Regions:
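Extracellular, disulfide-bonded carbohydrate-recognition/adhesion ectodomains
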Residues: 1-121
């Protein structure tokens, strides 16, 4: 959605619309989402449905098992305040190619950014 929200607000918006924040069960879905996010939808990142349930243990908000990941090098990490507990997909390329669309980063859940909801069939 083009609306910018914290991860928690995005979660609530998706639930209110009978959906979930998008989960990524495999590379095929990750590639689809990477291609789906059009220029202008997101600034640098876009919320997905992953969150750090316990330190070092990631889960999907829809309850599906965590079977796939596509972390950027050095991620997930933690900041001094230990608030990087939510998953975002990178939507831009850095000049040095250290960041590229489709890679994942753990981000402070309070930051506001675009997000993707999904609905079960």
């Amino acid at each position: 959605m083009r609306t910018k929200s914290s991860w928690y607000e995005a979660y609530d918006i998706c639930k209110a619309n009978n959906g979930d924040l998008a989960g990524v069960p495999d590379e095929e879905v990750n590639n689809f989402l990477r291609e789906y996010i059009p220029s202008g939808l997101a600034d640098d990142y876009c919320w997905l449905g992953g969150y750090e349930k316990n330190e070092g243990y990631w889960a999907w908000d829809d309850g599906h098992p965590w079977l796939y990941s596509n972390w950027q090098d050095g991620q997930p990490n933690t900041n001094p305040a230990n608030t990087e507990d939510c998953l975002a997909m990178i939507t831009w390329s850095s000049p040095d190619n250290s960041q590229e669309p489709g890679l994942w980063d753990d981000i402070d859940c309070a930051l506001e950014m675009a997000f993707i909801c999904s609905k079960s069939k």
